[in-house]
């Protein structure tokens, strides 16, 4: 019995020590905006989903203004398959035609968005699900992707259909929600001035939102620990110039390149710091914001 009591006392002591050490960081972020892009493996794991919702609720209860932006690529692919809708790809990128963009909006702004809202509300907070259409928050225009043919070296423009990029962000509605103690949960769907609906990459959408809000932090929850060096070791902090050099020497490659490019653009648009961290680690948001060592790679100007 003594051993059990001693173990319990040790656990409580560690918990108390964590809470005490977290206080300066809570004060640092009080009344600040933190945008969290939620995606990857964590979205498909119910335990991680509940932990994420609890983290977001705790941020709000600590006086921080959290804004959640979510993705949903795997869920969209699953619904398209169930509906018997075949996807066409250009250079590995899905072409979003008129029929598919309707499904995208249904899945992102509907089922996924409301599921996240429900998880946060279950933790005692007041979350509200929105997309770029609500309150004319975000306007998009058609995005074009250019590729270079490896044989002819001729540049070719890909038409990906209703894939867009944000060109205007109005923060008015988000500011009103912050004043109302509400937590916005945003789906990356937005209208164009042409009256069409566009599906936007969730990372890019989160970067645009964070820039418009001049967020203290933009957190990207991914399936990797952060930016790694060539030996596989986590790089804890980088500047824009260091990131550019790591791209040039091949340390940053593949799918990490567009992610860090989004990070750099967000910094140039007024975000103070951007963090790439592992969403598969329970409570990674709290570990990043409320501990000295953080939980991922911090990129600053």
Swiss-Prot record:
Transmembrane spans: none
Claim: Nucleotide-binding is one of the keywords in the record: yes
Family statement: Belongs to the acetylglutamate kinase family. ArgB subfamily.
CDD domains reported in the protein's UniProt record: AAK_NAGK-C
Site entry (Transition state stabilizer), positions: 37, 259
Domain of life (superkingdom): Bacteria
One MF term in the entry's GO annotations: acetylglutamate kinase activity
Pfam families named among the record's database cross-references: AA_kinase
Record-linked PANTHER family: N-ACETYLGLUTAMATE SYNTHASE (PTHR23342), N-ACETYLGLUTAMATE SYNTHASE, MITOCHONDRIAL (PTHR23342:SF0)
InterPro entries the record matches: AceGlu_kinase-like_sf, AcgluKinase_fam, ArgB, Asp/Glu/Uridylate_kinase, Glu/AcGlu_kinase, NAGK-C
BP term (GO), one: L-arginine biosynthetic process
Function, as annotated: Catalyzes the ATP-dependent phosphorylation of N-acetyl-L-glutamate.
Main location: cytoplasm
Pathway: Amino-acid biosynthesis; L-arginine biosynthesis; N(2)-acetyl-L-ornithine from L-glutamate: step 2/4
Compartment(s): Cytoplasm
Lineage: Bacteria, Pseudomonadati, Pseudomonadota, Alphaproteobacteria, Hyphomicrobiales
Keyword Translocase attributed: no
Enzyme nomenclature, EC number: 2.7.2.8
SUPFAM superfamilies: Carbamate kinase-like
Keyword terms, alphabetized: Amino-acid biosynthesis, Arginine biosynthesis, ATP-binding, Cytoplasm, Kinase, Nucleotide-binding, Transferase
Binding residues for substrate: 72-73, 94, 199
Protein name: Acetylglutamate kinase
Catalytic activity: N-acetyl-L-glutamate + ATP = N-acetyl-L-glutamyl 5-phosphate + ADP
């Amino acid at each position: 019995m003594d051993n059990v009591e001693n173990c319990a006392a040790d656990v409580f002591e560690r918990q108390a020590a964590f809470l005490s050490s977290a206080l300066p960081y809570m004060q640092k972020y009080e009344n600040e905006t933190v945008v969290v892009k939620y995606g990857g493996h964590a979205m498909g794991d119910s335990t991680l989903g509940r932990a994420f919702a609890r983290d977001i609720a705790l941020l709000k209860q600590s006086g921080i203004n959290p804004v959640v932006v979510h993705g949903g690529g795997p869920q969209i692919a699953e619904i398209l398959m169930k509906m018997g809708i075949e996807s066409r790809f250009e250079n590995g990128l899905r072409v979003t035609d008129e029929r598919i963009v309707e499904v995208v909006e249904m899945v992102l702004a509907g089922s996924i968005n409301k599921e996240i809202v429900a998880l946060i509300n279950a933790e005692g907070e007041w979350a509200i699900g929105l997309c770029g259409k609500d309150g004319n928050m975000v306007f998009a225009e058609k995005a074009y992707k250019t590729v270079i043919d490896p044989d002819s070296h001729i540049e070719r423009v890909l038409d990906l259909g209703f894939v867009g990029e944000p060109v205007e962000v109005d923060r008015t509605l988000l500011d009103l929600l912050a004043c109302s103690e509400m937590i916005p949960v945003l789906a990356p769907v937005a209208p164009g001035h042409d009256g069409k609906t566009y599906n936007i990459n969730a990372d890019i959408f989160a970067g645009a939102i964070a820039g418009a809000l001049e967020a203290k932090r933009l957190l990207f929850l991914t399936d990797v620990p952060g930016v790694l060096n060539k030996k596989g070791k986590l790089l804890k902090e980088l500047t824009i110039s260091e990131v550019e050099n790591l791209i040039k020497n091949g340390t940053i490659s593949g799918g990490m390149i567009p992610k860090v490019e989004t990070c750099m653009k967000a910094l140039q648009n007024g975000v103070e710091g951007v963090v790439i961290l592992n969403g598969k680690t329970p409570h990674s948001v709290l570990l990043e914001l409320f501990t000295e060592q953080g939980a991922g790679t911090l990129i600053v100007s």
